[in-house]
């Protein structure tokens, strides 16, 4: 039976949420072009679209907002943030950005410029959507080398975020000087929020360094990955989360971070460098016209203060055990109800295998997106597709290719919802499962050329 872990905090403030009728929700979804991204937030009862910037800050973070130094240059909040980065990660150089994609847009073009090959390529365990988009906007290719064990969602395996090291080595040999960087995504969002083992990070880093390839850590969910390493790897049992984090980042050369996840803030990102001062300076130059001056990067001083506090709060043992335990609780409720999910559950979300739940819907009609629409119609719960709609078309041929996954992500905001909300979500999805055979696929009315899933408009097939 699913186990409930109580929240390790008291609730000081509440925000009312509104339940609506099935008829109201159908009208709202039609007006949104059958795209949950385009729904009004006020029409959503429980919002599981993303964990990015949707969490609740602590009383200490709110107090930190009052300490904001809004100086255009040299803010003391920036200096505290840079000190926190040095303390936690051991990286000497910090550039704040408005969010993770801001870090990607100033870093990736410089890595492409440094690449010695004529057809630059970035390799990753699995690029997330915005990462892939920024790689391609920089004129490079994005190639994934994920362990094939992640593809069987019904089979439990502790490290479904790992690189397929044999494949990674083959690609490195085949591409040679074209490899601009290896990106280690922790946790691996597109595979189901799955962790990457320390041994795998170490091996990928060793391969990269043997070939002179820079290692970029996509660090959005670094603390959750460290928790999994401690819980699942006997070599790290009882080791402090902070020590595990420090070792993880020792294997990288730089990192990008959407701080809106494990930084526990509503806005913010980081682009940090261990010791490559020349690259740091080149990226700083891009920061000024794209993000803002180098000591604020599109952020208010108060937000940098909240981030400096949140980076440390996110390493708290009680918080992480509750956080990941709540996700596991929802996953277990769904398993008990016969809903197929990525097993074991990851750190930030439960990923429902829509290909198994809706086998009658082809990849080109986006089964996971159809399931997300049906869940909203059932109970006002907003989820998101991680599948063929998100994957997009092949950048050279323009053909729609099926994704290796057709997943619906139930993304749990941090410190926002209780276990009673998890029960409601599970009940709604189990009800949808009972009538799954009647769920229809979707086709485009409007298809944007880039990151289409955000603004596309669709209709039932």
Swiss-Prot record:
Pfam families of this UniProt entry?
Answer: Beta_elim_lyase
Complex formation: Homotetramer.
N6-(pyridoxal phosphate)lysine, modified sites: 261
Q: Which family does it belong to?
A: Belongs to the beta-eliminating lyase family.
**Keywords recorded for this protein, A-Z:** Lyase, Pyridoxal phosphate, Tryptophan catabolism
Q: What is its EC number?
A: 4.1.99.1
Catalytic activity, as annotated: L-tryptophan + H2O = indole + pyruvate + NH4(+)
Q: Which Gene3D superfamilies match?
A: Aspartate Aminotransferase, domain 1, Type I PLP-dependent aspartate aminotransferase-like (Major domain)
What protein am I looking at?
A: Tryptophanase
One of the record's GO molecular function terms: tryptophanase activity
Its cofactor is:
pyridoxal 5'-phosphate
Q: In which pathway does it act?
A: Amino-acid degradation; L-tryptophan degradation via pyruvate pathway; indole and pyruvate from L-tryptophan: step 1/1
């Amino acid at each position: 039976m699913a186990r409930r872990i109580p929240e390790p905090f008291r609730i000081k403030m509440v925000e009312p949420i509104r339940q609506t009728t099935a008829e109201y929700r159908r009208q709202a979804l039609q007006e949104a072009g059958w795209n949950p991204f385009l729904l009004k937030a006020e029409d959503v009862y429980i919002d599981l679209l993303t964990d990015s910037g949707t969490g609740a800050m602590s009383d200490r973070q709110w107090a930190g907002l009052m300490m904001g130094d809004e100086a255009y240059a040299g803010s003391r909040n920036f200096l505290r943030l840079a000190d926190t980065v040095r303390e936690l990660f051991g990286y000497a150089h910090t550039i704040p950005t408005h969010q993770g994609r801001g870090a990607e847009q100033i870093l990736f073009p410089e890595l492409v410029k440094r690449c010695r090959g004529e057809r630059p390529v970035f390799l990753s365990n699995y690029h997330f959507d915005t990462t892939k988009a920024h790689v391609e906007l920089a004129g490079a290719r994005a190639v994934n080398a994920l362990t094939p064990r992640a593809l069987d969602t019904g089979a439990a395996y502790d490290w479904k975020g790992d690189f397929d090291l044999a494949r990674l080595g083959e690609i490195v040999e085949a591409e040679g000087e074209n490899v601009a960087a290896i990106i280690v995504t922790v946790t691996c969002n597109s595979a189901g929020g799955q962790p990457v083992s320390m041994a795998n990070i170490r091996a990928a880093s060793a391969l990269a360094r043997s070939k002179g390839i820079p290692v970029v850590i996509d660090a959005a969910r670094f603390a959750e990955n460290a928790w999994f390493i401690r819980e699942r790897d006997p070599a790290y049992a009882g080791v402090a989360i902070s020590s595990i984090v420090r070792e993880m980042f020792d294997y990288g050369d730089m990192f990008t971070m959407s701080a809106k996840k494990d930084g526990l803030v509503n806005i913010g990102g980081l682009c940090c460098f261990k010791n490559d001062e020349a690259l740091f300076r080149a990226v700083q130059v891009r920061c000024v016209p794209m993000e803002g001056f180098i000591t604020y990067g599109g952020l208010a001083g108060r937000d940098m203060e909240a981030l400096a506090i949140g980076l440390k709060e996110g390493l708290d043992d009680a918080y992480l055990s509750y956080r990941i335990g709540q996700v596991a609780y929802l996953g277990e409720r769904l398993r008990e109800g016969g809903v197929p999910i990525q097993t074991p559950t990851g750190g930030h979300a439960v990923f429902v295998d829509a290909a198994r739940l809706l086998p009658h819907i082809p990849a080109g009609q986006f089964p996971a997106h159809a399931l997300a629409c049906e869940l909203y119609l059932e109970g006002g719960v907003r989820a998101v597709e991680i599948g063929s709609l998100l994957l997009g078309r092949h950048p050279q041929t323009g053909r729609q290719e099926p994704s290796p996954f057709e997943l619906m992500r139930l993304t749990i905001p941090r410190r926002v919802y209780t276990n009673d909300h998890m029960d409601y979500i599970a009940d709604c999805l189990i009800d949808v499962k009972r009538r799954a055979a009647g769920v229809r696929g979707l086709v485009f009315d409007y298809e944007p050329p880039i990151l289409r899933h955000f603004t596309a408009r669709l209709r039932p097939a």
